[in-house]
């Protein structure tokens, strides 16, 4: 099962909601072929791949191949990327700034997750962006306090330092309300 496939499926379904819902009626799934409206092999020479590394290698090795993965895999394999039309009617590349614009237009939920607005016109927003999340034990789980300090420090590093160390891989430093919410969530790790 793939989180990337599930997120891509959510985009395909969300972007086609409303009057065009029949274009992508199935619910998102971790397996791309199980969420497509029709069996892909009936229309295309379809070859799935498990994991972004295998997918990127497969796309690179086949003339005319297309695929979807995190932008870092396409960058590191020197593969081209497609511009995707957003609801502001712009064709946008998958850049860190465009992903940040899209996620910044989302709703920050109480648990820190972001609900993405596929049908919201966000100028400059790349509409297939997604956030990464860290799952940790809540204070109520009464885990070892010293280990929890390490977990909190790791998440602080990811939030404050990691993105600025690896911008060439497409990581972005979050800011504003989303950053504030992430810091508040990290403060709960005890």
Question: Where do the model's predicted regions map?
Answer:
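Flexible loop/hinge segments at secondary-structure junctions
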Residues: 1-190
């Amino acid at each position: 099962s793939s989180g990337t496939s599930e997120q891509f499926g959510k985009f395909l379904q969300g972007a086609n909601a409303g009057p065009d819902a029949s274009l992508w009626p199935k619910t998102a799934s971790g397996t791309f072929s199980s969420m497509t409206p029709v069996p892909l092999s009936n229309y295309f020479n379809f070859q799935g791949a498990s994991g972004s590394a295998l997918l990127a290698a497969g796309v690179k090795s086949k003339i005319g191949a297309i695929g979807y993965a995190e932008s870092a895999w396409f960058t590191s394999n020197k593969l081209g990327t497609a511009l995707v039309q957003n609801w502001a009617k712009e064709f946008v590349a998958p850049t860190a700034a465009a992903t940040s614009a899209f996620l910044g237009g989302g709703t920050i939920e109480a648990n820190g997750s972001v609900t993405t607005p596929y049908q919201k016109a966000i100028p400059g927003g790349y509409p297939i962006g997604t956030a990464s999340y860290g799952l940790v034990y809540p204070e109520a789980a009464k885990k070892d306090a010293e280990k929890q300090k390490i977990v909190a420090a790791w998440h602080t590093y990811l939030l404050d330092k990691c993105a600025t160390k690896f911008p060439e891989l497409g990581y972005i430093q979050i800011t504003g309300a989303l950053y504030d919410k992430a810091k508040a969530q990290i403060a709960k790790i005890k």
